[in-house]
Structure formats: C-alpha cells, structure tokens
Swiss-Prot record:
One Gene Ontology cellular component: extracellular region
Top-level taxonomy: Eukaryota, Metazoa, Chordata, Craniata, Vertebrata
A matching Pfam family: Antimicrobial_2
Family per record: Belongs to the frog skin active peptide (FSAP) family. Brevinin subfamily.
Transmembrane segment boundaries: none
GO biological process: defense response to bacterium
Disulfide pairings: 27-33
Name listed for the protein in its UniProt record: Brevinin-2HSb
Keyword field: Amphibian defense peptide, Antibiotic, Antimicrobial, Disulfide bond, Secreted
Tissue distribution: Expressed by the skin glands.
Localization per record: Secreted
Source organism per UniProt: Odorrana hosii (Hose's rock frog)
Length: 33
C-alpha cells in the first residue's frame, strides 16, 4: 500500500544519505578527496 511505499522510500533515502556520509568520511580519512 501507500504506507509501505513511503516507508521504503524513507529507508532508501536513509541508506543513500548514510552511504554518502560514509564515503565522505573514508575519503577524508584516506585523503583521496
């Protein structure tokens, strides 16, 4: 239903945000930016 769709969108958005934060952190730590 609609709620499931919204929930999945929220989960995917959170995963995407977390991934970019992790990428930024590892990039800064290894100085590959």
């Amino acid at each position: 239903g609609l709620l499931d769709t919204l929930k999945n969108m929220a989960i995917n958005a959170a995963k995407g945000a977390g991934q970019s934060v992790l990428n930024t952190l590892s990039c800064k730590l290894s100085k590959t930016c």
